[in-house]
């Protein structure tokens, strides 16, 4: 079985892992209530999506 010839340095390892990260969620204000919500999802505070109430929310 093959063995690495040289030890991978901290810098090389960190440069390689620089692209492995979480993306920030795309938040947009809800046109119905104004709360921030994730784009293309039902608003968790009012239950509206695309101008229609989709989910009944208990306040």
Swiss-Prot record:
Please list the coiled coil stretches. none
SUPFAM superfamilies linked:
Zn-binding ribosomal proteins
Which GO terms of the cellular component aspect does the record hold? large ribosomal subunit
Q: Name one GO molecular function term.
A: structural constituent of ribosome
Keyword Ribosomal protein appears in the UniProt entry: yes
The cross-references to Pfam families, in alphabetical order and at most eight, read: Ribosomal_L32p
Q: Provide one Gene Ontology biological process annotation.
A: translation
- Name the keywords, alphabetized: Ribonucleoprotein, Ribosomal protein
Question: What family is this?
Answer: Belongs to the bacterial ribosomal protein bL32 family.
Under which name does UniProt file this protein?
Large ribosomal subunit protein bL32
State the organism of origin.
Lactiplantibacillus plantarum (strain ATCC BAA-793 / NCIMB 8826 / WCFS1) (Lactobacillus plantarum)
Gene giving rise to this polypeptide: rpmF
């Amino acid at each position: 079985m093959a063995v690495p010839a040289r030890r991978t340095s901290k810098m090389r390892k960190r440069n390689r892992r620089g692209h492995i990260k979480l993306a920030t969620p795309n938040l947009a204000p809800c046109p119905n209530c104004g709360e921030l919500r994730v784009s293309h999802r039902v608003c968790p505070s009012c239950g509206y999506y695309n101008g229609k109430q989709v989910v009944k929310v208990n306040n």
